[in-house]
C-alpha cells in the first residue's frame, strides 16, 4: 500500500447525500477481484448515458475535475453493501481522500485498508470546502496528515481528527499484510520455537 503523508490536488464537489456503494461502483463491475481497472466504473450510472457516452453534467467529467484526487461529498458517504470494490474504484480513478460530514462504518474502515484517507468535518466546514471545490481549476486543497490539517486555496486551515493507529498505518503505507510483516522477526522466532518443541509437525 502506498504511503499517505500529504496530498495537494484538485478537489471535486459532489453535492449528493447518502452516496451508497452501488452508486460508487455498480454490481456489473463486481465480477473481478483485481483492484485495478475499476476506475472506469466509478459512478458509472452518473458518469455515462445509456448509450455509453459521457454525461457532461457530472462533476468528474468536467475538464476541471477529471484529475481530481480529493472528493468533497455529502453526508453518510459509502452507505449500502460492504463491497470493497468501492474504495478500489476510487483509488484506481485517482481519489486518495474523501471529505464528508459522516461515513458508513464499513466503507470508512475499508478506506484505511486501501490507502484512502476519509476525513470527517462539521457541516459548516464542509460548506466552506464545497465552496472552495467549486472554483474549478483553482479548486486545490492540501491535506497534511501529520499535522491533521486541510489547507484551502485562500490559506484557511481546518483541523481534523484521526485514530492514531490508523494515522500510523497510512503514514507508513501499512495494510493488514504490511502490519503482519512488521512482526516478521517475532513470527519467525515463534515458528522456530514451536518447531523445536513439536518436531513431528
Curated annotation (Swiss-Prot):
Any single GO CC term annotated in Swiss-Prot or TrEMBL for this entry: 3-isopropylmalate dehydratase complex
Enzyme class, spelled out: lyase
InterPro entries the record matches: 3-IsopropMal_deHydase_ssu, Aconitase/3IPM_dehydase_swvl, AconitaseA/IPMdHydase_ssu_swvl, IPMI_Swivel, LeuD
Coiled coil: none
Pfam families assigned: Aconitase_C
Pathway entry: Amino-acid biosynthesis; L-leucine biosynthesis; L-leucine from 3-methyl-2-oxobutanoate: step 2/4
Keyword terms: Amino-acid biosynthesis, Branched-chain amino acid biosynthesis, Leucine biosynthesis, Lyase
Family to which this protein belongs: Belongs to the LeuD family. LeuD type 1 subfamily.
Function of the protein: Catalyzes the isomerization between 2-isopropylmalate and 3-isopropylmalate, via the formation of 2-isopropylmaleate.
Protein name: 3-isopropylmalate dehydratase small subunit
Organism: Methylocella silvestris (strain DSM 15510 / CIP 108128 / LMG 27833 / NCIMB 13906 / BL2)
Gene encoding the protein: leuD
Amino acid at each position: 500500500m502506498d504511503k499517505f503523508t500529504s496530498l495537494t490536488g484538485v478537489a471535486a464537489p459532489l453535492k449528493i447525500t447518502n452516496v451508497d456503494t452501488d452508486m460508487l461502483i455498480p454490481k456489473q463491475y463486481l465480477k473481478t477481484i483485481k483492484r485495478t481497472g475499476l476506475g472506469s466504473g466509478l459512478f458509472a450510472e452518473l458518469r455515462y448515458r445509456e448509450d455509453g457516452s459521457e454525461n457532461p453534467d457530472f462533476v468528474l467529467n468536467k475538464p476541471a475535475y477529471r484529475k481530481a484526487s480529493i472528493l468533497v461529498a455529502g453526508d453518510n458517504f459509502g452507505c449500502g453493501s460492504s463491497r470493497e470494490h468501492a474504495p478500489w474504484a476510487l483509488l484506481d480513478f485517482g481519489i486518495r481522500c474523501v471529505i464528508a460530514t459522516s461515513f458508513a462504518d464499513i466503507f470508512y474502515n475499508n478506506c484505511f485498508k486501501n490507502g484512502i484517507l476519509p476525513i470527517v468535518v462539521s457541516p459548516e466546514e464542509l460548506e466552506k470546502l464545497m465552496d472552495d471545490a467549486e472554483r474549478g481549476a483553482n479548486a486545490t486543497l492540501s491535506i497534511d496528515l501529520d499535522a491533521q490539517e486541510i489547507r484551502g486555496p485562500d490559506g484557511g486551515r481546518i483541523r481534523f481528527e484521526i485514530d492514531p493507529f490508523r494515522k500510523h498505518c497510512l503514514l507508513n503505507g501499512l495494510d493488514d499484510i504490511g502490519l503482519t510483516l512488521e512482526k516478521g522477526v517475532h513470527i519467525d522466532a515463534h515458528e522456530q520455537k514451536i518447531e523445536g518443541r513439536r518436531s513431528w509437525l
